[in-house]
């Protein structure tokens, strides 16, 4: 199978870059700059990502770049540098990189001045092209052995270079973002130059992952952390397909679930997937430990530690359990700061209960069969495993549950309030036939009360916020319905108006409803 190694220097777009390459049916994997070269030298191509580093203000060229380019000198294995990746390549080939010079952010027009294999059948000399830039440093002069393919119209700075003989290419812009219209075609050309075969599919992933699970587990037993969501359901189905009754599924009722969730889990796993499940009610334990806790990171840590403690109790009832299966996916690892080959150089956004919330004393070895997949890939995998569309299209639900949708202190009363409001909202979205055209929708309960009037009397109740977003892979998101057609927009506005009335009239304790229109970034999809 063809494979592309992406060296991640901390770009916010690295995960998107990996996803775009997979869209071309070529497997890509992300590695930190401190990876040992021997672990990655068997790939078909290298890509050096962008990132916040500055060549003029750094301690020199990273060792991994030296290793890759020395290997390229012997083998001509293709190398692509993007943004900072271009700058570090240029510096290696004796070009000057200047800090805070010719900055460019956003849409930029290029003048194409020379033909190259990297732009074949896309652009040609004399064309102008639209791309997306995000850089403060610039390559000042032409790297040794390279030719300039394009300059920026804005300031005549170097935007694209090529060394055709050694098959090394550099782009100051970001071909991986959707704002570079021809970006996917440029990546496809680079992968064609590398001779990559389009042989990565979900079907091949299933076969490979089953073999990997069997090899990792041997004759031991696995206890599975089920949530009832898409990720853990698909992970359980894949693992069960690989090892059968060696998998023991446990569903913990933590008291922070969606309305009637336990019954839905029974229907899903026992009736549809035919996978045995042990259901354990520990809602009182979770709510007691979360009493008076308001900090979202502490909530996540407490929930993660409590989950593991309970799983260890359940595992002790079985013999030979050494592994814990989780439905961790790529964005979970990214937002938690990551671990291993896909760790980020960026800051931690939030701890994911499957990743950053796990206690260091955890006794289990982890089985995470989906940790290299994005959400849409997980759904494709689920369809190939025979899981129904209704299950696969369930909106994402956070591992810590309603704990991160109740801002501030958590009480049983607030949980019931939020469950009722969320159930009303989701059912109305389904009534208006909008559920399947959005990525995620939910209600957030705020820690503030507002004055209202009901039945000629003053009320003083909680405010809640409705949220709905569209996304492709969970890495970025747009507020719904502003990205949709006019008919869908009006339908949704009627829906949230009806939801507001229904929540206020039906849910005791809520007297005001607002709507969140913030995109990701700058916000995350969840509030905590």
From Swiss-Prot:
Every Glutamine amidotransferase type-1 domain range: 3-199
GO MF entries: ATP binding; GMP synthase activity
Keyword line: ATP-binding, Glutamine amidotransferase, GMP biosynthesis, Ligase, Nucleotide-binding, Purine biosynthesis
Positions of the GMPS ATP-PPase domain: 200-394
InterPro entries tied to this protein: Class_I_gatase-like, GATASE, GMP_synth_C, GMP_synth_GATase, GMP_synthase, GMPS_ATP_PPase_dom, NAD/GMP_synthase, Rossmann-like_a/b/a_fold
Active site per UniProt: 83, 174, 176
Record-listed ATP binding positions: 227-233
Documented EC number(s): 6.3.5.2
Catalytic activity: XMP + L-glutamine + ATP + H2O = GMP + L-glutamate + AMP + diphosphate + 2 H(+)
Gene Ontology terms: cellular component: cytosol
Assembly behavior: Homodimer.
Biological role stated in the UniProt entry: Catalyzes the synthesis of GMP from XMP.
Name of the protein this chain belongs to: GMP synthase [glutamine-hydrolyzing]
Species per Swiss-Prot/TrEMBL record: Ehrlichia ruminantium (strain Welgevonden)
């Amino acid at each position: 199978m063809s494979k592309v190694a992406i060296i991640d220097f901390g770009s916010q777009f690295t995960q998107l870059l990996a996803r775009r390459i997979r869209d071309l049916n070529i497997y890509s994997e992300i590695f930190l700059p401190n990876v040992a070269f021997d672990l990655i030298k068997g790939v078909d191509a290298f890509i050096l990502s962008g990132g916040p580093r500055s060549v003029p203000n750094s301690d020199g060229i990273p060792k991994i770049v030296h290793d890759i380019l020395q290997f390229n000198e012997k083998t001509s294995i293709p190398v692509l540098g993007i943004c900072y990746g271009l700058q570090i390549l240029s510096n290696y080939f004796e070009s000057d990189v200047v800090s805070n010079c010719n900055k460019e952010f956003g849409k930029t027009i290029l003048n194409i001045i020379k033909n190259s294999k990297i732009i074949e059948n896309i652009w040609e000399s004399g064309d102008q092209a639209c791309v997306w830039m995000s850089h403060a440093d610039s390559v000042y002069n032409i790297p040794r052995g390279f030719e300039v393919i394009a300059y920026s119209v804005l300031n005549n700075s170097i935007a694209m270079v090529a060394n055709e003989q050694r098959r090394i290419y550099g782009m100051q812009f970001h071909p991986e973002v959707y704002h570079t219209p021809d970006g996917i075609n440029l990546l496809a050309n680079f992968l064609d130059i590398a001779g990559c075969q389009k042989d990565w599919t979900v079907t091949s992933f299933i076969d490979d992952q089953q073999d990997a699970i069997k090899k990792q587990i041997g004759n031991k037993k696995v206890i599975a952390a089920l949530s009832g969501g898409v990720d853990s359901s698909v992970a359980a189905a894949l693992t069960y397909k690989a090892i059968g009754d060696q998998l023991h599924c446990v569903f913990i009722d933590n008291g922070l679930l969606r309305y009637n969730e336990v019954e839905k889990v029974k229907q899903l796993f026992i009736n549809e997937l035919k996978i045995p499940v042990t259901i354990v009610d520990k809602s009182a334990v979770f709510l007691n430990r979360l009493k008076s806790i308001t900090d979202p990171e502490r909530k996540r840590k407490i929930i993660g530690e409590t989950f593991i403690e309970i799983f260890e109790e359940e595992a002790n009832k079985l013999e030979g359990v050494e592994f814990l299966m989780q439905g961790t996916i790529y964005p979970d690892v990214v937002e938690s700061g990551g671990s291993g080959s896909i760790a980020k150089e960026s800051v931690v956004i939030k701890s994911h209960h499957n990743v950053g919330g796990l206690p260091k004393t955890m006794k289990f070895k982890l089985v995470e069969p989906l940790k290299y997949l994005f959400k849409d890939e997980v759904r494709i995998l689920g369809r190939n495993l025979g899981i129904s569309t209704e299950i696969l299209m369930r909106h994402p639900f956070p591992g810590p549950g309603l704990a991160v949708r109740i801002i501030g202190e958590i009480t049983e009363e607030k949980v019931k309030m939020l469950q009722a409001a969320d159930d009303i909202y989701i059912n109305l979205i389904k009534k208006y036939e909008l559920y399947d055209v959005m990525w995620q929708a939910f209600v957030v309960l705020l820690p503030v009360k507002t004055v209202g009037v009901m039945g000629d009397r003053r009320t003083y109740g909680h405010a809640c916020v409705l949220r709905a977003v569209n996304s492709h892979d969970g890495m970025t998101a747009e507020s719904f319905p502003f990205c949709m057609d006019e008919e869908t927009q009006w339908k949704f506005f009627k829906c949230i108006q009806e939801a507001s009335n229904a929540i206020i009239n039906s849910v005791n304790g809520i007297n005001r409803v607002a709507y969140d229109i913030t995109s990701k970034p700058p916000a995350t999809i969840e509030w905590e």
